[in-house]
Curated annotation (Swiss-Prot):
This is Adenine phosphoribosyltransferase. Belongs to the purine/pyrimidine phosphoribosyltransferase family. NCBIfam families: apt, PRK02304.1-3, PRK02304.1-5. It is found in: Cytoplasm. It catalyses: AMP + diphosphate = 5-phospho-alpha-D-ribose 1-diphosphate + adenine. One of its GO terms (molecular function) is adenine phosphoribosyltransferase activity. Transmembrane segments: none annotated. One of its GO terms (biological process) is adenine salvage. It is an enzyme of class 2 (transferase). Signal peptide: none annotated. GO terms for cellular component: cytosol. HAMAP family: Aden_phosphoribosyltr. Its EC number is 2.4.2.7.
Length: 182
């Protein structure tokens, strides 16, 4: 199946001034309304990681769950859930971080990873990088390492990919948008 970048990008809806004025939200729900586009996304990630040497897939609450869980299934990898504060029932590790919207906390079950584990992290997009950096900090606190951060969309003008790369976390995104791109 050929990856059609322009058609793919047309399925990501820009929503101006959401969730607050001045933000252009990249809505991926139309992408998931197209089985062909969804398959292209999943297949692209599966092909990237099928021969890679890592042990777990970490998914960010909530849109990272959509892609990462299917990729984990396809690659037969354990899934680690990184959730918003207060959503996990057992002992957790917590990490504060800044988003483009304000401060938040990311949590993970404290027994999710062990020393020597290696994790590909999945989210829907990389904006400021705050969520993925918080997840990387949690991964490292458990003695594991980050293999790569993966997302559907990169918003390079917000600096998240650069911040991740500066922290020696490689990134992989299927597409990118300029902030003013419609």
């Amino acid at each position: 199946m050929t990856f059609d970048q322009s058609n793919f990008k047309s399925l990501i809806r820009p929503v101006v001034d959401f969730p607050k004025p001045g933000v252009v939200f990249r809505d991926i729900t139309p992408l998931f309304q197209s089985p062909k586009a969804t398959r292209q996304v999943i297949d692209s990630f599966v092909q990237r990681y099928i021969d890679a040497e890592f042990s777990h897939i970490g998914v960010m609450d909530a849109r990272g769950f959509l892609i990462g869980s299917v990729v984990a299934y396809q690659l037969n990898k354990p899934l680690v859930l990184f959730r918003k504060q207060g959503k996990l029932p057992a002992d957790v590790l917590s990490e504060a971080y800044q988003t483009e919207y304000g401060e938040a906390y990311l949590e993970v079950h404290a027994d999710s990873l062990c020393e020597g584990d290696s994790v590909v992290m999945f989210d829907d997009l990389i904006a400021t990088g705050g969520t993925l950096i918080a997840a990387a900090n949690l991964i490292r606190r458990m003695g594991a390492e980050v293999y790569e951060a993966a997302a559907i969309i990169d918003l390079p003008e917000l600096g998240g990919s650069k911040r991740l790369n500066d922290l020696k976390i490689p990134t992989f995104c299927l597409t990118e948008f300029a902030l003013d791109e419609q």
